[in-house]
């Protein structure tokens, strides 16, 4: 807190109580070399990209091979964001979320991350292979990684009992 708080009573005097939401300053900035730095970028940028793609499909009247649904969650970080029922006929879901970089990982900030497995287990083999094929066919630089300490919304979709193929990119 940006206040002089030492006790529960001090916090309550400011109108703060247990159960209140905590919102962190995202610390957004653009570096001299043009990089965007901020907390929570994965969700914001993923959402913007998906909304931009939806607008492109609509404006250009692009006919897709199958129906595409966008599902945005606000409970991702607590593990049940993707638990909502999926529309009838949906056989595959992709989570667009994590693009981790760091020690022990192959991906860089300039690549699409294809996740083969996370803390919930492996992603659908056919979906992962399709993601790799599509990246290659479209000249998209990518890396395949495993995130043993992370989970995704599409993992929650499976745990909710939805029998679908699933994948994760970031």
Regions found by a protein language model. Name each.
Residues 1-170:
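N-terminal hydrophobic/helix-forming segments and targeting peptides
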């Amino acid at each position: 807190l940006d206040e002089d708080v030492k006790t529960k009573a001090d916090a309550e005097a400011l109108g703060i109580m247990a159960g209140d939401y905590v919102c962190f300053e995202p610390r957004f900035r653009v570096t001299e070399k043009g990089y965007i730095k901020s907390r929570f970028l994965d969700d914001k940028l993923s959402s913007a990209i998906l909304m931009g793609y939806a607008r492109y499909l609509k404006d250009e009247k692009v006919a897709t091979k199958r129906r595409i649904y966008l599902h945005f969650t606000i409970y991702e970080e607590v593990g049940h964001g993707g638990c909502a029922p999926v529309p009838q006929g949906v056989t595959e879901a992709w989570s667009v979320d994590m693009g981790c970089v760091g020690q022990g990982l192959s991906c860089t900030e300039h690549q699409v991350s294809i996740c083969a497995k996370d803390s919930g287990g492996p992603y659908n083999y056919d979906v992962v292979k399709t993601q790799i094929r599509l990246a290659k066919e479209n000249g998209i630089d990518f890396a395949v990684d495993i995130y043993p300490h992370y989970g995704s919304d599409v993992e929650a979709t499976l745990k909710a009992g939805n029998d679908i193929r699933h994948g994760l990119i970031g």
